[in-house]
Curated annotation (Swiss-Prot):
Main location: membrane
PANTHER family assigned: ZINC TRANSPORTER ZUPT, ZINC/IRON TRANSPORTER
Protein name, UniProt field: Zinc transporter ZupT
Highest taxon of source: Bacteria
InterPro entries, A to Z: ZIP, Zn_transptr_ZupT
Keyword annotations of the record: Cell inner membrane, Cell membrane, Ion transport, Iron, Membrane, Metal-binding, Transmembrane, Transmembrane helix, Transport, Zinc, Zinc transport
Catalytic activity: Zn(2+)(in) = Zn(2+)(out)
Compartment annotation: Cell inner membrane
One MF annotation (Gene Ontology) recorded for this entry: metal ion binding
Function: Mediates zinc uptake. May also transport other divalent cations.
HAMAP family in alphabetical order: ZupT
Transmembrane segments: 5-25, 32-52, 61-81, 137-157, 171-191, 195-215, 236-256
Binding site for Fe(2+): N120, E123, N149, E152, E181
Length: 257
C-alpha cells in the first residue's frame, strides 16, 4: 500500500475521533444539538466559499462560466434532493418525549452526512494526488484534513445520536462521511493516479460547494434556531468557521493553500 493512500486513509479515519466525542456522556441537549448544527454550517460555509469555490475557479483550464455553472448546479441539485425527502413540522423537534425524534431531524442528519460525504470524496482524491506529487506537502494536507475531520465527525454524530438515540448508529453515520474520503483516495489510487484532469476536479469541487452552501443556509441554520429558539445559532456558525479557518491556516503554512 502506497504512502499517499495511507495518509488519505488516516485523514479520513480522524472522523471517528469526532464521532466518539459526539456520543460521549448523556444524549445531547437541544442547546448542544443546535450548537452542533450551527457548527456544521460554519464548517461547510467556510470550506465552500473560502476554499473550494475559489480553488475551482482558479484551476487551470476552468472558465468562470463552467465554475459558477457547476456551483449553481450543486445548489439546484440540493434542492432537488430536498424535495424528494419527507418533511415534518419543525416545532415537533422541541417535544421532550421518550419517542424517537421526528423525521425532520433524521432528514437533516441524512442531508448533513451526504453533504459532508460529498465534500470528503473529492478531498480524498486531492489528498492522494497531492501526496503522490509531493510527499512533504501530502503530510501537511493530510494533517490539516484530519484536524478538520474531527469537528465534522462531531457535527454528524450529534444530530444522528439525537435522532436515533443510538451511539453505534451515530458513530456509523459519522464514519460514512469519513469513509467517503477514503473511497476517493482509493479510487484515485486505482484509476486516476496523478493524471486526474484539473478541470474535472475543479468542476466537482464547485458543484459540491454549491450543495454545501445550500445545505447550510436552507437546512442547518434554520433548524438550529427552531430547536433552540432561546439561543443564536450564529455562535455555533462562528465557532465552526474559526476551527475550519485554523485548519486552512495550517494548509497555507504547509505551502498548499
Amino acid at each position: 500500500m502506497s504512502v499517499p493512500l495511507i495518509l488519505t486513509i488516516l485523514a479520513g479515519a480522524a472522523t471517528f475521533i469526532g464521532a466518539f466525542l459526539g456520543v460521549l456522556g448523556q444524549k445531547p441537549s437541544n442547546r448542544l444539538l443546535a450548537f452542533s448544527l450551527g457548527f456544521a454550517a460554519g464548517i461547510m460555509l467556510l470550506i465552500s466559499l473560502m476554499e473550494m469555490l475559489p480553488a475551482a475557479l482558479a484551476a487551470e483550464g476552468m472558465s468562470p462560466v463552467l465554475g459558477y455553472g457547476m456551483f449553481i448546479f450543486g445548489l439546484l441539485g440540493y434542492f432537488g434532493l430536498d424535495r424528494m425527502l419527507p418533511h415534518a413540522h419543525p416545532q415537533d423537534l422541541m417535544q421532550k418525549s421518550v419517542q424517537p425524534l421526528p423525521k425532520s431531524l433524521k432528514r437533516t442528519a441524512i442531508l448533513l452526512t451526504l453533504g459532508i460525504s460529498l465534500h470528503n470524496f473529492p478531498e480524498g482524491i486531492a489528498t492522494f494526488v497531492t501526496a503522490s506529487s509531493n510527499l512533504e506537502l501530502g503530510f501537511g494536507i493530510a494533517l490539516a484534513v484530519a484536524l478538520h475531520n474531527i469537528p465534522e465527525g462531531l457535527a454528524v454524530a450529534g444530530p444522528v445520536y439525537a435522532a436515533t438515540g443510538s451511539k453505534r448508529t451515530a458513530i456509523l453515520w459519522a464514519g460514512i462521511s469519513g469513509l467517503a474520503e477514503i473511497l476517493g483516495g482509493v479510487l484515485a489510487w486505482l484509476i486516476l493516479g496523478s493524471m486526474i484532469s484539473p478541470v474535472v476536479m475543479a468542476a466537482i469541487m464547485a458543484a459540491v460547494a454549491g450543495i454545501m452552501v445550500a445545505l447550510s443556509v436552507d437546512e442547518l441554520m434554520p433548524l438550529a434556531k427552531e430547536i433552540d429558539p432561546n439561543n443564536n445559532p450564529s455562535y455555533g456558525v462562528l465557532c465552526g468557521m474559526s476551527v475550519m479557518g485554523f485548519s486552512l491556516v495550517l494548509l497555507q503554512t504547509a505551502g498548499i493553500g
